[in-house]
């Protein structure tokens, strides 16, 4: 998949992205705001294994955010199951040199639209750590609405923290 946007291209991951992924992903500021499944330190081996793991996943739900041809981050969603099959959880990160340019917001809007159109979703939500003001602002600029605070719901780097629940809800057409 490839979605050309103004500030970036959201596209499928490629093996050639591994070095840029390792270079940008190996950053404390990024790791501190992601789930523990994201390794730290982030090595070239981690990057190659991650990209390889995506090859056989269908449907494709995890994408590179490329800026000037270089993988500079990731955006993806997890489709929920059973009675929540009309929902997905979304997540993203962008390399520090690209912060503050609207890139994450543009990528988030594009993938939100893609996920809704491709998977007949009615709701997409995100759970940033409460202290991640920049991510909360990205969500708000992308049309997500704060629904609540999940108190003491996560632990990162040995610290128990709150998460905020943001959601983009497709308007009811009935």
Predicted regions, residues:
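A short helix-loop-beta-strand connector motif used in the catalytic cores of GNAT acetyltransferases and
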Residues: 52-64
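Acyl-donor (CoA/ACP) binding surface of acyl/acetyltransferases
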Residues: 1-29, 62-174
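Conserved GNAT-fold acetyl-CoA-binding loop/helix
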Residues: 29-52
């Amino acid at each position: 998949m490839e979605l050309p946007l103004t500030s970036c291209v959201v596209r499928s991951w490629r093996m050639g992205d591994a070095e840029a992924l390792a270079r940008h992903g190996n950053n404390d500021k990024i790791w501190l705001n992601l789930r523990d499944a994201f390794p730290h330190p982030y090595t070239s081996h981690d990057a190659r294994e991650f990209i390889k793991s995506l090859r056989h996943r269908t449907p494709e739900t995890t994408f590179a955010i490329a800026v000037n041809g270089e993988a500079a981050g990731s955006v993806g969603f997890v489709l929920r199951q059973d009675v929540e099959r009309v929902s997905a959880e979304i997540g993203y990160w962008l390399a520090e040199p690209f912060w503050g340019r609207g890139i994450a917001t543009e990528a988030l809007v594009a993938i939100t639209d893609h996920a809704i159109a491709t998977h007949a979703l009615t709701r997409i939500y995100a759970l940033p750590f409460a202290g991640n003001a920049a991510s909360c602002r990205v969500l708000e600029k992308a049309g997500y609405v704060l629904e609540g605070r999940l108190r003491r719901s996560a632990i990162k780097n040995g610290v128990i923290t709150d998460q905020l629940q943001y959601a983009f809800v497709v308007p009811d057409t009935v």
